[in-house]
């Protein structure tokens, strides 16, 4: 396990060569990929969202495709289509852009709802269904989507059903002064990507994902996650609390956090460290809470503060 743990950390080091000054963002995305999750990256244009996704594909030696989501992108561009071949008298399937290990959906909230919905089965089942035939996608498979803040020209809010399928949502933010100086010194931008070297491959990632699945989680930690989720459902400031899928995402990310920390068991701090990244994009304020100046960040902090934490102790079986 230790050897693969070090490989995962080596990936974050390589990605950080192209995405300067954002080690926490890079680490959270690595956790999501280890937990078989999909990632939503939200921020204004020009802060390196696309570069981040490309750097991960390069460092992990994954096949990857990118689609710029515009209003004229069709579902068939994403999932593929069948074309009749006159010579054989049969329909032949032509794979879409998601037939890869890492699919980058760039500016996902600029396209139509119909095209966005084409991603739902892809993200949940890692498969596409075209003309009644379901085809599995290559493994490992991750959707990494970028979106501009709602309110930007030409954007629309993603539906809750799609947001819930993203394991985490991370915000890039502006680089600090030193990082921005280095970005300017290394123009054009591909000069930053050229620094990233492959340090593992898809088989390594599949092995790591299996190891993360095997990280031990006690009943006390599971109960803690359930109580956190229930607290959001019972909070009167929220119109929409956390779903059971969100609880599963918290558990998966907590296992990945423990794995990257070199532990074979989940501790309470693993849950609290990732809770906001997993839950922020899933929660919806009531109109009254919004007009009253309440924020999702405050509610998450309240939930973490008021929900009793299990005592941090190593499992008795010595794992």
Predicted regions and their residues:
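Canonical AAA+ ATPase core
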Residues: 85-90, 111, 115, 123-215, ...
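Walker B catalytic acidic pair
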Residues: 43, 106-107, 118
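P-loop (Walker A) phosphate-binding loop of NTP-binding proteins
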Residues: 44, 78, 146
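Conserved alpha-helical scaffold flanking the Walker A/P-loop in AAA+ ATPase domains
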Residues: 28-31, 84-104
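Walker A/P-loop
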Residues: 33-70
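Pre-Walker A (pre-P-loop) alpha-helix and adjacent loop at the N terminus of AAA/AAA+ ATPase modules
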Residues: 2-47, 230
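Conserved AAA+ ATPase small/helical "lid" subdomain
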Residues: 195-250
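C-terminal engagement/docking regions of AAA+ P-loop ATPases
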Residues: 234-319
